[in-house]
């Protein structure tokens, strides 16, 4: 009896060893850009669009022109990832969304608080849910499949693959006001140049390349004929490519917790000259925007140093003169700041990459960048220092 029992046990063990549970789980091949919807970091984010590389001959293209910063909230809709500007007059209000970061739905006419969050943009994409493929007996085969059940509510889908090249921008920004698309037509579809999607750690960055052609009616406004020997030579500049960088970064990655804002009277601004941020506040009694508030723009004075990166082209051999001059200038500035003493609230400027390129894009909100434009531009762009500010 015992021998027979042992034999049966051995056969059972052998069969168990050949089952699906011991096989490696075979996952569906995923797009590299795919993210889990639950991983979208909760809270508010900063958003800034920036024009990237542009041809030097394009009169209406301003390379590395920073758009206006936006303080936003994010949630998923059926169309994709929606970016909405927060309601500054009610800073404690938040977009309604469920545990998986899908936007809430207003069930009643009176429940309309969500419309107070201005539309900024939508990143379209595809949603998916996955499950284990089952055999005829309903057992898992250790092979994953996409859940194609038509009755599955989109809010039950667990993953999102963005299509940033189909970006839908709703807001007006500085790029629109400065004529980035005025007098030109876009040709074809944008091309995704680079991307860094890590929503769990508060990062959604990407860069698009777009192709434009000057409208025939505006050709004299957007081609500098004075620099051309003939009409044929001038017409070559009638079409071009430009790049646009979009940076979405969670506030925890860039804002200093506990920072105290400084009110900055207009009289002081006229005498001293710091950059400022102005806004109008809603009076809760009169329901009118009758309060002007001006804040001083500054770095957090309590940090040890203000870190800057140099753009990659500083380290090209032809630009060594600019590199040396920049480093020497920063040293002189720090010497002047040190005169005020260590307790003066004036951190020194630190160049992080003094000897080699760091691959940091000037449009990435996580970094301060000194960007070298090392060739003459037909639009006459001069040096300027745009900054993003906490609202």
Regions found by a protein language model. Name each.
Residues 1-2, 208:
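Intrinsically disordered, low-complexity sequence elements enriched in Ser/Thr/Gly/Pro
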Residues 14-17:
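C-terminal motif of bacterial Sec signal peptides marking the signal peptidase cleavage site
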Residues 346-356:
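Conserved small-residue hinge/capping positions at short loops/turns
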